Amino acid sequence: MSRALFAVVLAFPLIALANPHYRPDVEVNVPPEVFSSGGQSAQPCTQCCVYQDQNYSEGAVIKAEGILLQCQRDDKTLSTNPLVWRRVKP
């Protein structure tokens, strides 16, 4: 009895591999827009400051028209984008 059971257990993986219906091919149709921007700009960042179509994270410092600006959290505002540009005093 145990020899027969052992033979069945050994033969099962071979039967499973021989059966093409056991592992069917899967096709996933994905539109080309998923892999390319299609000429569109990047999605807006929800936790960034934006300057000249560039996203900056919290703490970033830039110089705009001779003025230093830092991307900081705005504690007074309840919103989905609580970061704002604040002037940095020299």
Curated annotation (Swiss-Prot):
UniProt KW keywords: Signal
Signal sequence coordinates: 1-18
A Pfam family it matches: DUF1496
InterPro entries reported for this sequence: DUF1496
Domain of life from the UniProt record: Bacteria
Record protein name field: Uncharacterized protein YnjH
Gene that encodes the chain: ynjH
